[in-house]
């Protein structure tokens, strides 16, 4: 895997840091912001989805450098990075201004188009709990929330038979009962909770729903193990948020 930094890896790291959560004044956030502010990382008005250095190391097929893929997929990446910049006390005025321009343009597109690439709706969803931190626009917070939830309803995969492959499950958009999309996806959320319980192997964790299609087989096995761990933590957190995991009762542990 590419040991060099990339905007996509940076976004993934910041998403994990936010979930933990880590101190936004700490070295991870500040280092990420410094990296994103480098002229060498820029792509058009934001950052690229793929970088040329990826091709020198084992990588997923969709992460090979591809200018056309950058045009199609950088929207969601840029919106996600802009949210991290604007909601985690970034002190760099130029970087904040860049992030605000990205978000303002994204809000205009939110109401005028349907296709936002693979990550677009997911990253719009990330804003639902932080609408008060959006830059000023012509749209109210209620209008923005309604439009995002509508897009989520259109994007979510409703067929449980399709959840075994890489599709946007309900848990991509709803992580707790307080999430904005939960009332409209409640039945689907309950179905996925059942699905996770029913499909968890007895002596393992869930398999990831994607592959590298035979590319870099040895490196893929390493990446597969990492991703299985990450997705297992996500799934357990999802189950816990909806009270689907019974707590261990103290005094009943088996020490044999």
Where are these regions (language model features)?
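Ser/Thr/Asn(+Pro)-rich, low-complexity disordered segments
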Residues: 1-8, 12, 131-154, 244-246, ...
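Long, well-ordered core segments of solenoidal/helical folds
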Residues: 1, 27-47, 92-115, 143-161, ...
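Long, positively charged, glycine-interspersed low-complexity recognition regions
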Residues: 213-256
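Phosphate-rich cofactor/ligand-interacting catalytic cores and adjacent structured alpha/beta frameworks
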Residues: 59-62, 71, 76, 83, ...
């Amino acid at each position: 895997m590419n040991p060099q930094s990339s905007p996509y890896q940076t976004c993934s790291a910041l998403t994990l840091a936010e979930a933990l959560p880590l101190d936004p004044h700490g070295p991870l956030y500040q280092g990420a912001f410094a990296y994103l502010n480098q002229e060498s990382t820029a792509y058009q008005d934001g950052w690229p989805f793929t970088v040329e250095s990826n091709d020198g190391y084992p990588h997923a097929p969709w992460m090979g450098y591809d200018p056309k893929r950058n045009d199609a997929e950088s929207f969601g990446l840029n919106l996600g990075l802009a949210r991290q910049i604007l909601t985690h006390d970034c002190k760099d005025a130029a970087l904040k201004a860049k992030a605000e321009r990205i978000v303002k343009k994204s809000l205009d597109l939110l109401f005028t188009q349907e296709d936002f690439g693979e990550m677009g709706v997911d990253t719009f969803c990330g804003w639902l709990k932080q609408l008060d931190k959006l830059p000023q626009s012509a749209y109210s917070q209620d209008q923005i929330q309604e439009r995002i939830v509508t897009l989520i309803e259109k994007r979510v995969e409703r067929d449980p038979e399709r959840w075994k492959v890489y599709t946007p499950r309900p848990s991509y958009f709803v992580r707790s009962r307080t999430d904005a999309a939960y009332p409209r996806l409640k039945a689907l959320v309950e179905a996925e909770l059942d699905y996770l319980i029913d499909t968890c192997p007895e002596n393992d964790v869930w398999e990831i729903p994607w592959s590298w299609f035979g590319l870099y087989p040895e490196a893929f096995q390493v990446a597969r193990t990492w991703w299985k761990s990450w997705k297992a933590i996500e799934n357990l957190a999802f189950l816990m948020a909806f009270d689907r995991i019974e707590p261990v009762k103290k005094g009943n542990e088996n020490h044999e």
